């Protein structure tokens, strides 16, 4: 498993705690709840993602609502919301990462923590977001 994938997994677990039980973000990002060894690179990447989502959550949630077609944010599972949040952040703030890689990572995380059906939903929403919000702004 790549360090970026582990970092995304850690970020997802942090965001889940923050969203579901209201854990303070700084407390969650200490990772003292995680019982496996974490490299500095994995932790730094997870912290980057969590801080980015926390700081931009309202704007990201507005985008999720826009592209989730007939789904209220509250109807989307906590795991799926968190995956969407960190993936939209990556698409917006990490232009050096290829969009298909970010979207594939989101799909893989969804398969790992949710269902195949959820993975299709995540893939469709992120693809639509990318094509309408990111792709038109990329240099051609």
Swiss-Prot record:
Question: What does the record give under GO molecular function?
Answer: RNA binding
Any idea which UniProt keywords this protein has? RNA-binding, Transcription, Transcription antitermination, Transcription regulation
Q: Name one Pfam family in it.
A: NusB
Kindly give the InterPro entries that the UniProt entry links to this protein: NusB-like_sf, NusB_fam, NusB_RsmB_TIM44
**Gene3D superfamilies from the UniProt entry:** NusB-like
Q: Name one GO cellular component term.
A: cytosol
**The keyword Lipid biosynthesis belongs to this UniProt entry's keyword annotation:** no
What processes does the entry annotate via GO biological process terms? Answer: DNA-templated transcription termination; transcription antitermination
Q: Which domain of life is it from?
A: Bacteria
Q: What task does this protein carry out?
A: Involved in transcription antitermination. Required for transcription of ribosomal RNA (rRNA) genes. Binds specifically to the boxA antiterminator sequence of the ribosomal RNA (rrn) operons.
PANTHER family xrefs? ANTITERMINATION NUSB DOMAIN-CONTAINING PROTEIN (PTHR11078:SF3), N UTILIZATION SUBSTANCE PROTEIN B-RELATED (PTHR11078)
Family indicated by similarity:
Belongs to the NusB family.
Q: What is this protein called?
A: Transcription antitermination protein NusB
User: In the UniProt record, what gene is named as encoding this protein?
Assistant: nusB
